């Protein structure tokens, strides 16, 4: 029997208690270890639920390891890898979103990278969390790198079909991604329709910058909100703290 690991169990228990969750994504390509540690400490202090580490390009090897270690040294939050490919794996993390980019046109991002990385995940003893990853317009860098056919913003049923297929394939999470730095988030109506057909937790990320957007997305059905660029683009730790607190207020 497949056992659910500690991180996934923690996520499920938090959601079952009626909470909406906030994960912060740190890209090692844009954030040096010292800053990653400071952001992680801040995240824990304001009530963020987990740290995701990864990026579309460049997040691998010693650079990735050093960022993960700095985060682990600075906070007790779960660290979940969010790899761009099979090279984005660090033995120092707690878990990995073992995800398939369902609407890629390239089989490498659907099952190829996963096959190449599977033995590394097993050897490192990382907790794999199976996840259906779906790119929504505009898709930004991740859409281009992952050779995705982004779901049109006005076609929510297409997103729902992919999400339900992911659930039926055994994925225990669905992630709707507008792309890091997207001008706007996934449309709330798309979130609502996807949530109405799936029975697994729904993550929404990309283009989320304000508490009002968070409020709208969680009201539509998002269980977990992911922010990255909104925090990375702040000019100081104090500004990052204010932004995190604003986003946290949107969850309530």
Swiss-Prot record:
GO terms for molecular function: imidazoleglycerol-phosphate synthase activity; magnesium ion binding; phosphoglycerol geranylgeranyltransferase activity. Its cofactor is Mg(2+). Pathway: Membrane lipid metabolism; glycerophospholipid metabolism. It catalyses: sn-glycerol 1-phosphate + (2E,6E,10E)-geranylgeranyl diphosphate = sn-3-O-(geranylgeranyl)glycerol 1-phosphate + diphosphate. Prenyltransferase that catalyzes the transfer of the geranylgeranyl moiety of geranylgeranyl diphosphate (GGPP) to the C3 hydroxyl of sn-glycerol-1-phosphate (G1P). This reaction is the first ether-bond-formation step in the biosynthesis of archaeal membrane lipids. Pfam families: PcrB. Keywords: Cytoplasm, Lipid biosynthesis, Lipid metabolism, Magnesium, Metal-binding, Phospholipid biosynthesis, Phospholipid metabolism, Transferase. It is found in: Cytoplasm. CDD domains: PcrB_like. Signal peptide: none annotated. Its main location: cytoplasm. This is Geranylgeranylglyceryl phosphate synthase. GO terms for biological process: glycerophospholipid biosynthetic process. Belongs to the GGGP/HepGP synthase family. Group II subfamily. Sn-glycerol 1-phosphate binds at residues 175-181, 206-207, 228-229. PANTHER family: GERANYLGERANYLGLYCERYL PHOSPHATE SYNTHASE, IMIDAZOLE GLYCEROL PHOSPHATE SYNTHASE SUBUNIT HISF/H IGP SYNTHASE SUBUNIT HISF/H. It comes from the Archaea. GO terms for cellular component: cytoplasm. Its EC number is 2.5.1.41. Mg(2+) binds at residues 27, 56.
């Amino acid at each position: 029997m497949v056992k659910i690991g500690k991180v996934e169990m923690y996520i499920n228990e938090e959601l079952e208690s009626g909470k909406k969750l906030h994960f912060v994504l740190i890209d090692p390509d844009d954030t040096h270890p010292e800053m990653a540690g400071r952001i992680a400490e801040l995240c824990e202090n304001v009530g963020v639920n987990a740290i995701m580490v990864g990026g579309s390009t460049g997040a691998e090897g010693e650079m990735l390891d050093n960022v993960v270690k700095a985060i682990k040294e600075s906070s007790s939050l779960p660290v979940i890898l969010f790899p761009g490919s099979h090279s984005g794996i660090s033995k120092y993390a707690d878990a990995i979103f073992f995800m398939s980019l369902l609407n890629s046109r390239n089989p490498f991002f659907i099952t190829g990278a996963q096959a190449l990385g599977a033995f590394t995940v097993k050897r490192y003893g990382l907790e794999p969390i199976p996840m259906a990853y779906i790119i929504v317009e505009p898709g930004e860098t991740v859409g281009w790198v992952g050779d995705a056919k982004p779901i049109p913003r006005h076609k929510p049923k297409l997103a729902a079909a992919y999400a339900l297929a992911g659930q039926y394939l055994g994925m225990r999470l669905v992630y709707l991604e507008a792309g890091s730095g997207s001008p706007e988030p996934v449309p709330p109506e798309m979130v609502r329709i996807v949530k109405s057909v799936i029975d697994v937790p729904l993550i929404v990320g990309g283009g989320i910058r304000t508490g009002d957007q968070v409020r709208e997305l969680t009201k539509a059905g998002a269980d977990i909100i992911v922010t990255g660029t909104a925090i990375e683009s702040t000019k100081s730790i104090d500004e990052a703290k204010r932004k995190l607190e604003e986003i946290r207020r949107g969850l309530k």
